[in-house]
């Protein structure tokens, strides 16, 4: 199977592949079981993916009736051996708060005894979709995930840093056994040893062993001070360039760390980008709108392809939130469809395995559809994902733009 460049950040768009190829049905001996011509001219039926003719209309869910937010997602396009383009949406788990469980999704016609509970429309046209749940555990597909820890390295965060270092290896092994191909990165922020920046250290995306080695250089919050890896010098230069100066090296601003990772780290094409922000302080943008949590509300600023943020909050105190100065860091999760968890200031009542982000990754989905040839014109197209559980306890809609790429004329 040919795999093309998946997602390139554009202004408010998901770009699914910058490539040229023709979609031709090369049916020959043995191919008929895989590619079938639908009775409707021009519509291909790829084995395992229902045709658009089988698709049903998505439920209409008014915004005021939505019960949750869907996670941000990536969209990619692949050409199979027979020259047919298949679009895939990679999304982490959807939590069913009413039933206290992660939702298993079923596409067109239902599957595994489940009735359909997820729908995809492209430019208001229902698509026939196939859904793979990693929770089913058959290992037939691998989900790419690039996970970045944003760690507040102020003096009060030693226990969190120590807990992360102690648990990362076993935790990553458990995630891998769930069918995840995962890489890890880290950004330390707040109380930087460098002047005029909140970015105190970090390591680009690496293996679990690579991240553990980085964290094991020292103890406490010193674990996330300084840069390591092949591009350590480049990361330090970027951190101290002035671009990530939010007024003070002591401002604890998770948004600065997020923007740093987004702009400087080498994310893999097609990987689901996941961030976990560990902090015990408000987001402190120092008056700068670019570092405010509200930056994430606008999909032109932060597209679904750029990832979902999960929050670990280790402060039982109360705050009077002030926009642009002392902001609720959990809003980073709210605006991107992530999760939040409160833990005690000593990180003694939680493990990495307990965090909601673990369940979200272990219950990821791959949603596939085809018949996109007419959409491969280099222009943005509107994709809408609708989720409605059988008991209607979970009702949510996410809409975003995708450029599916270009095909040869």
What name fits each language-model region?
Residues 380-384:
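Short, conserved beta-strand segments of beta-strand-rich sandwich/propeller modules, principally
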Residues 27-31:
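Bacterial signal peptide processing site
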Residues 35-366, 371-375, 387-408:
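Divalent cation-coordinating acidic motifs and surrounding scaffolds
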Residues 2-14:
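Bacterial N-terminal signal peptides that target proteins for export
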Residues 22-25:
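C-terminal motif of bacterial Sec signal peptides marking the signal peptidase cleavage site
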Residues 14-16, 360:
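A generic structural signal for short, non-catalytic loop/turn and secondary-structure boundary residues
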């Amino acid at each position: 199977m040919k795999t093309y460049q998946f997602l390139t950040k554009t202004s408010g768009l998901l770009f699914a592949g910058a490539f040229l190829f023709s979609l031709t049905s090369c049916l020959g001996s043995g191919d008929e079981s895989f590619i079938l011509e639908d009775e409707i001219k021009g519509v291909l039926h790829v084995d395992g993916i229902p045709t658009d003719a089988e698709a049903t209309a998505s439920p209409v869910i008014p915004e005021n009736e939505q019960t949750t937010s869907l996670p941000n997602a990536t969209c990619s396009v692949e050409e199979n051996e027979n020259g047919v383009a298949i679009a895939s949406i990679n999304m982490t788990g959807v939590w069913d708060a009413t039933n206290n469980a992660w939702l298993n999704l079923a596409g067109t016609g239902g599957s595994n005894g489940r009735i359909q509970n997820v729908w995809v429309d492209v430019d208001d046209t229902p698509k026939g979709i196939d859904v793979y749940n990693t929770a089913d555990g058959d290992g037939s597909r691998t989900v790419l995930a690039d996970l970045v820890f944003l760690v507040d390295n102020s003096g009060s965060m030693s226990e969190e840093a120590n807990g992360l270092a102690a648990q990362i290896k076993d935790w990553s092994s458990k995630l891998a056994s769930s069918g995840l191909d995962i890489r890890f990165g880290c950004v330390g922020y707040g109380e930087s040893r460098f002047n005029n920046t909140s970015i105190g250290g970090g390591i680009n995306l690496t293996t679990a062993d690579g991240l553990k080695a980085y964290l094991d250089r020292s103890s406490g919050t010193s674990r996330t001070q300084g840069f390591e890896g092949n591009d350590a010098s480049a990361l330090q230069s970027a951190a101290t360039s002035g671009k990530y100066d939010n007024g003070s090296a002591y401002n604890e601003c998770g948004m600065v760390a997020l923007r740093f990772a987004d702009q400087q780290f080498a994310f893999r094409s097609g990987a689901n980008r996941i961030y976990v922000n560990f902090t015990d302080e408000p987001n402190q943008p120092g008056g700068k709108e670019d570092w405010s949590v509200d930056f994430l509300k606008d999909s032109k600023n932060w597209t679904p392809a750029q990832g979902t943020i999960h929050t670990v909050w280790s402060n039982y105190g109360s705050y009077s939130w002030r926009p642009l100065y002392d902001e609720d860091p959990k809003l980073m999760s709210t605006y991107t469809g992530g999760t939040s968890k409160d833990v005690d200031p000593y990180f003694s009542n939680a493990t990495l395995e307990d965090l909601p982000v673990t369940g979200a990754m272990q219950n990821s989905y791959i949603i596939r559809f085809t018949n996109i040839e007419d959409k491969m014109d280099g222009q943005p197209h509107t994709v809408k994902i609708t989720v409605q559980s059988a008991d209607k306890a979970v009702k949510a809609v996410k809409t975003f733009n995708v450029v599916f790429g270009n095909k040869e004329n």
